[in-house]
Amino acid sequence: MNYASILEQIRGDLQPFLGTGKVADYIPELATVPADSFGMAIVTASGEIFRTGEADTRFSIQSISKLFACTLAFQLLGDALWERVGREPSGTAFNSLVQLESERGKPRNPFINAGALVVTDVLCRRFVQAETALVEFMRRLTGETSIDYDSRIAQSELQHAHRNRAMAHFMASFGNMEMPPEVVVDAYCRQCAISMSCVELAKAALFLTNHGVAPVTGERILDTSSAKRLSALMLTCGTYDAAGDFVYRVGLPAKSGVGGGIVAVLPGEMAACVWSPALDSNGNSAAGVLALEWLTTYTGQSIF
């Protein structure tokens, strides 16, 4: 497969669409990123790297961090994790509180904010600094020791985290928080503020294409069954309440973030990451979704 030429074709075709949408502005630091930025990378299961545009520019991974936080929590608890967070699509916005009342403080899945807060609570219970543990995990997955979180973005998020605090306190009232809500929200905002590039995120997700083993180090991250299950959750819940449309158009398990990144995996073949910060109405990168749709169209590769 000539991924290099396909990426260049996607980049050329995408030019009229760059900047379409709106950069996230409820986190002020994110609003400063140029809306027409674009990068895309593919890392194959054999370790080959293909890139186009600003594929080596680091950006705020935001909700993509939920995938890797969930991986760590799954390592720690196994299936016991699902006693505290569900595995169903929510059908509501990623920061909605609506279902928490009727479902007694158990979030629908680990990729909406409420579910990610429960996952972060698990990590805070296990690690002195959950966000540091996640940063170290990302460094191990990629071999890049300079990966870290952006303290300015973390502070910006903390100043505007009222809804996340409300969710954490609400779940605590149902007994689904073991650590103080403020500690959990602080760690959550810092993990969302991790900065990585398209190449680095594709490398990090590669274990999902390789039966749970990170090709960079040979480390087993998850057993084969757990890697399959985590990929299934990405497919059904990874792109907010647009997951059905995303699967229809793209046909790959993926996790998106309001920083404009989307990471996607094709088991046994490759991991891809695209970044373009202008978002559609669901909080997914508008150009990013289109780029991944064209990737599976031009290559003829998807899980279906």
Curated annotation (Swiss-Prot):
Root EC class: hydrolase
Catalytic activity, EC: 3.5.1.2
Protein's UniProt name: Glutaminase
Family: Belongs to the glutaminase family.
Keyword Glycosyltransferase: no
GO biological process, one term: glutamine catabolic process
Gene Ontology terms for molecular function: glutaminase activity
NCBIfam families, alphabetized: Gln_ase, PRK00971.1-1, PRK00971.1-2
Chemical reaction(s) catalysed: L-glutamine + H2O = L-glutamate + NH4(+)
Assembly and binders: Homotetramer.
Keywords, in A-Z order: Hydrolase
Binding site for substrate: 63, 113, 157, 164, 188, 240, 258
Classification via InterPro entries: Beta-lactam/transpept-like, Glutaminase
Transmembrane segments: none
Species of origin: Paraburkholderia phytofirmans (strain DSM 17436 / LMG 22146 / PsJN)
